Amino acid sequence: MKKLILMIASILLLSACSTADATTQDLKKVEDKYDANVGVYALNTATDKEITFNEDKRFAYASTFKALSSAMLLEKTPHNELNKKVHVSKEDIVPYSPVLEKFINKDTSIKKLIEATMLYSDNTANNMIIEELGGYKEVNKRLKSLDDKTTKPSRMEPELNNYNPKSNRDTSTPQAFGKTLNKLINDGRLSKENKTFLIDLMINNKSGDTLIKKGAPKNFKVADKSGQAITYASRNDVAFVYPKGESKPIVLVIFTNKEGKTDKPNDKVVSETAKVVLEKFNDK
């Protein structure tokens, strides 16, 4: 009986190693096909199964950080206080603010700031969220309290999108970002109402339609936040992916870039990476 148990354990171990090797090879093929660097952290929260690839490599996170900043503000703001007024001045407005540019010298609300940054990736809205949190000093304190000493928020929008691979500013790793995303949004730190509000925004935004959503099986529900830096072809997407009938999501972080500063990003790198990873989770 003992020999049988050991044999079964060995077979399962070999099978797991074989699957991991196959996943690695498939992701390397995506890198080679597009001459890109790919980083992945994926966690099936229903089974605790992980898929990782270059998970400790640093990438510019770009606008994907808006998911973390929005979650932090929702963490500290009760749902019945989301209509708290916030004044928008002309000096607040930065490039790419399609919503907030209509509110110059007017009041908006915390709820509207989060909607603007998550649905439309409004840069001014995210800057104002950071200010509501007490600035990056407080944001970094919160990250460290979540055991994230890797993610390095530093600059406001839009400067944070000017990625320099020689600097750690405004970068993270897929693994660090994914674990923090999971802790903040999925692990019970938000009220039920605020979590539902944020996840619904991530489902309904359209900026990620060509990214993880495109690579996911048709019957999977995807709640995502995309990001794109202005250098090194940085293109990212972070998501909670819900297989059909599942209430517990797959946490998926995909960061990509290229070696040339003026190289252009390609959404297919992200979508094809997502397809590889999610097919592995979908294998029976």
Over which residues does each language-model region extend?
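Mid-domain, small-residue-enriched loop/turn segments at the edges of structured enzyme/sensor domains
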Residues: 127-189
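Positively charged n-region of N-terminal signal peptides that target proteins for export
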Residues: 1-4
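C-terminal motif of bacterial Sec signal peptides marking the signal peptidase cleavage site
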Residues: 13-16
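Short, conserved catalytic-motif segment at the N-terminal edge
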Residues: 36-38, 42-58
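Acidic helix-start/capping segments at beta-turn-to-alpha-helix junctions
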Residues: 84-99, 133-134, 160
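Active-site SXXK
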Residues: 48, 59-91, 252
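Structured C-terminal helix/loop/strand segments within mature extracytoplasmic catalytic/sensor domains
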Residues: 18-28, 32-34, 50, 132, ...
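Conserved catalytic neighborhood of penicillin-recognizing serine enzymes
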Residues: 94-129, 136
